[in-house]
């Protein structure tokens, strides 16, 4: 009987731990891309984070534009992280490699550095990456300070000049949490 209760308790705890693993988390914020001292700033990029397990996750970056160069969105799999004190998650400096298909051609992305933090107190994500794209001989850096956003669906009513009402019952917008 004791084994049955122990098994039931372990099953409930495992289920509770899995419930803590969220789906994809979206973070929006200002970013900077740099190649050969040419900075391109974007006031609002969205980065996605999906937990794989309690020590790693997948990070998806948006399209990165630097003058005439557009790097398609790509995912970095199994980014390692540790949970620290004061609800701060740290992604220690690590290398990465991934591929992206552009116009039917596969391009390698080789990262010499990825590091970042997620602060649960203010829901902010900071990432800094250095990588080479395809046959590009120069390093590209990408950095972003973003905040967790959550889609909210609710009706919205706008009154213009006290004379015109606009109602939309089916609107979804992202709210910074």
What are these regions (language model features)?
Residues 1-26:
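Bacterial Sec-dependent N-terminal signal peptides
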Residues 117-118:
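Helix-rich interaction surfaces within compact, conserved domain-sized segments
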Residues 20-28, 39-43, 73-86, 113, ...:
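Edge beta-strand at a domain terminus
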Residues 40-45, 49-114, 175-177:
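Predominantly extracellular/secreted and cell-surface proteins with exposed
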Residues 9-11, 31, 168:
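Prokaryotic Sec-type signal peptides and long signal-anchor helices
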Residues 33-37:
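The phosphoinositide-binding surface of pleckstrin homology
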Residues 7-11, 59, 138:
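Intrinsic-disorder/low-complexity peptide segments enriched for small residues
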């Amino acid at each position: 009987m004791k084994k049955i209760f122990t098994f039931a308790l372990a099953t409930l705890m495992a289920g509770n731990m899995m419930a803590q693993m969220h789906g994809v988390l979206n973070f929006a914020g200002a970013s900077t891309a740099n190649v050969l001292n040419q900075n391109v700033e974007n006031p609002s990029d969205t980065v996605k984070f999906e937990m794989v397990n309690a020590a790693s996750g997948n990070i998806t970056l948006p399209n990165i534009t630097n003058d005439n160069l557009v790097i398609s969105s790509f995912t970095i799999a199994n980014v390692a992280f540790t949970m620290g004190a004061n609800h701060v998650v740290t992604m220690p400096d690590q290398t990465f490699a991934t591929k992206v298909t552009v116009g039917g051609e596969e391009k390698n992305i080789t990262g010499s550095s990825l590091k970042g933090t997620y602060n649960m107190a203010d829901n902010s994500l900071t990432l800094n990456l250095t990588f080479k794209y395809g046959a590009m001989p120069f390093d590209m850096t990408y950095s972003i300070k973003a905040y967790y956003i959550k889609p909210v669906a609710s009706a919205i009513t706008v009154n213009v000049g006290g004379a015109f009402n606009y109602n939309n019952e089916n609107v979804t917008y992202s709210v910074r949490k």
